[in-house]
Amino acid sequence: MRSIPIQQSPNQSITVTLDGNRWSLTIKTANDTMCVDVDLNDTPILRGQRAVAGMPVIPYRRLAAGQGNFMFVTERDDNPWWERFTVDQSLHYVTA
């Protein structure tokens, strides 16, 4: 599992290369929850996925073409929330 740097910001975009793939994530607020858009090698694979602690961001392995996945880790399994990013909530990449 590899830590992915996120900011304490309500809306942000991250682009990282992991395992030879270019991942682009957009994390944004939607009312009282966080949602994630994911692109793999410039191809959109997910839009508006609700961020849930301890669960894969990409809910179906086939969407990521057998590549890795992302997971929010939070204290007490609280729902991810931007004000807690870098305090007691983080984003991680898990290799397939």
Residue spans for each PLM region:
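Beta-strand-connecting loop/turn residues
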Residues: 21, 32-34, 89
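Residues that cap or initiate secondary-structure elements
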Residues: 10, 22, 31, 42-44, ...
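Short, exposed beta-strand/loop patches in secreted or surface proteins that constitute
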Residues: 5-7, 27, 61-63, 83-84
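Acidic, aromatic-enriched beta-alpha/helix-loop junctions
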Residues: 29-72
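C-terminal low-complexity, charged extensions that often adopt amphipathic alpha-helices
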Residues: 70-96
